[in-house]
Amino acid sequence: MILSKETIINGKRAICRSYAKINLTLDVGGKRSDGYHEIKTVMQTVNLFDLVIVDKCDSEIKITTNKKFLPTNSKNIAYAACEEFFKALGIPGGARIFIHKNIPIAAGLAGGSGNGAAVLCALNSLYSQPFSDNELEKLALKLGAD
């Protein structure tokens, strides 16, 4: 299942659709060391998405959004995803991220998780694919269980 598909512009900007999803089944397992639970799920994307635009930046992570009440710091999963990406890559880096929210917040549709996944995929493309899909999945697991 593709959660995001990015379009790269001039090697410095990635534009992604971050699709909502619904769980068709959800089995909750044991608690992980990070406090989240292991889950097994069958999910399906739906035709509702947030637009995520990621621009390469040398040093800072800056998030802007069309919703004033969304966090723009490390409490935002997209911000945390960016931090994890550069930590794993072992280089200083940053990004300017704009999130146009269409997915309802806290509705169980994985809007925030999808935004984090979109940022990881976008950065991976912008930095010439340093991580495999499996490695990106491991980075994403550090951010949550969705």
Feature map (PLM): residue ranges:
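Residues within alpha-helical segments
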Residues: Y79-E83, L120, L141
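Alpha/beta catalytic cores of group-transfer enzymes, especially the acyltransferase/condensing modules
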Residues: F131-D146
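Short, small-residue alpha-helix embedded
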Residues: S113-Y127
